[in-house]
């Protein structure tokens, strides 16, 4: 058999083996069989020793051409096998895009967070700045700077969480106001709100908690009047409870303001006619306020003959309870998903 015939038969057999390889592993075995170091094509080179010298270059060229032909067929078959494998995988893993997606539980903002942010947004629009402070506070800022002397009943150990004789968990966010005024060195204006957690030694029940949230506001400047306070609180009431709400100011007493008032809003449920929400009075108490006491201004470094101001404080817990008809303050702090899911639905409707 001539060398030419041998190469022709080898080529035909290689093409058959390549086409019959059904996976990449089988194709690799074919490659080794023909193109490996001990493969059939490499074996052809052994025939060169029996050829005349003038025929050896031509024979070597034909062997290299055969090697290249087989390699090209191998590469083409390799690409085809990869494509077939991918098509099979896609066919087996076909996704029906019309099927409903997997339900994923998504959280939402806590009702207290929503209420606090709503209040903050209002006052940011009025030019106030948000100031945060320490929850562990000095007695000096929590009481003395706010016109609460050592003998005041609010300083009783039974009413506050004292850590040492001079350190306690703040009972209100008013220390933030005191520290802010002190940091201004008697120069106005001051226009801030102070949100945060506060702590009091209350027994937990439906309307009381040892920990709750509070937002206080403070404005100090020249010629600040009671009418400025009233206008601010009217705007707040309308923002929180509806544009047709009215407010009522009742005389009260707070050590750090003079005069002091309790602020009521006309009942948003019965429109002032009387119901269980307003206890049949037509009014709902929402916060306390007043003009900053001259002693508080002086202790913070402000000249009370030149500067005046107003302050107010509210509990977002109570406001959220009123807005959403919540009867127990403890629901805010128990992380009951059944309770919180109700507000996710309200948020989805855009009612919050």
From Swiss-Prot:
It is found in: Cytoplasm. Mg(2+) binds at residue 258. It catalyses: tRNA(Phe) + L-phenylalanine + ATP = L-phenylalanyl-tRNA(Phe) + AMP + diphosphate + H(+). Belongs to the class-II aminoacyl-tRNA synthetase family. Phe-tRNA synthetase alpha subunit type 1 subfamily. Gene3D superfamilies: Bira Bifunctional Protein, Domain 2. One of its GO terms (biological process) is phenylalanyl-tRNA aminoacylation. This is Phenylalanine--tRNA ligase alpha subunit. Its main location: cytoplasm. GO terms for molecular function: ATP binding; catalytic activity, acting on a protein; magnesium ion binding; phenylalanine-tRNA ligase activity; transferase activity; tRNA binding. Binds 2 magnesium ions per tetramer. Its cofactor is Mg(2+). One of its GO terms (cellular component) is cytoplasm. The lineage of its organism: Bacteria, Bacillati, Bacillota, Bacilli, Bacillales. It comes from the Bacteria. Tetramer of two alpha and two beta subunits. The keyword Metal-binding applies. PANTHER family: PHENYLALANINE--TRNA LIGASE, MITOCHONDRIAL (PTHR11538:SF41), PHENYLALANYL-TRNA SYNTHETASE (PTHR11538). The keyword Isomerase does not apply. Its EC number is 6.1.1.20. Keywords: Aminoacyl-tRNA synthetase, ATP-binding, Cytoplasm, Ligase, Magnesium, Metal-binding, Nucleotide-binding, Protein biosynthesis.
């Amino acid at each position: 058999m001539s060398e030419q015939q041998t190469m022709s038969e080898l080529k035909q057999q290689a093409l058959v083996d390549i086409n019959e390889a059904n996976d990449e592993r089988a194709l690799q075995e074919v490659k080794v069989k023909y193109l490996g170091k001990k493969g059939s094509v490499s074996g052809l080179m052994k025939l060169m020793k029996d050829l005349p010298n003038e025929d050896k270059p031509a024979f070597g060229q034909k062997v290299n051409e055969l090697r290249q032909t087989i390699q090209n067929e191998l590469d083409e078959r390799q690409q085809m096998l990869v494509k077939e494998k991918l098509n099979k995988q896609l066919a087996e893993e076909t996704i029906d895009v019309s099927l409903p997606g997997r339900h994923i539980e998504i959280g939402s903002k806590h009702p207290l967070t929503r209420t606090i942010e709503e209040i903050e947004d209002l006052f940011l629009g009025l030019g106030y700045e948000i100031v945060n402070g320490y929850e562990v506070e000095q007695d000096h800022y929590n009481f003395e700077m706010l016109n609460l002397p050592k003998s005041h009943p609010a300083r009783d150990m039974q009413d506050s969480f004292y850590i040492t004789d001079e350190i306690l968990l703040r009972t209100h966010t008013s220390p933030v106001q005191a520290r802010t005024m002190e940091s201004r060195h008697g120069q106005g204006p001051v226009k801030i709100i102070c949100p945060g957690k506060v702590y009091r030694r209350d027994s937990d029940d439906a309307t009381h908690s040892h920990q709750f949230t509070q937002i206080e506001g403070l404005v100090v400047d020249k010629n600040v009047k009671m009418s400025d306070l009233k206008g601010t609180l009217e705007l707040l009431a309308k923002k929180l409870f509806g544009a047709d709400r009215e407010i009522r100011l009742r005389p009260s007493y707070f050590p750090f303001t003079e005069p002091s008032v309790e602020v009521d809003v006309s009942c948003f449920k019965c429109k002032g006619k009387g119901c269980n929400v307003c206890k049949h009075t037509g009014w709902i108490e929402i916060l306390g306020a007043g003009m900053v006491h001259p002693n508080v201004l002086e202790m913070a470094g402000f000249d009370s003959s030149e500067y005046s101001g107003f302050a107010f404080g509210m509990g977002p817990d109570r406001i959220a309870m009123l807005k959403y008809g919540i009867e127990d303050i403890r629901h805010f702090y128990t992380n009951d998903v059944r309770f919180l899911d109700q507000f996710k639905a309200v948020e989805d409707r855009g009612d919050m």
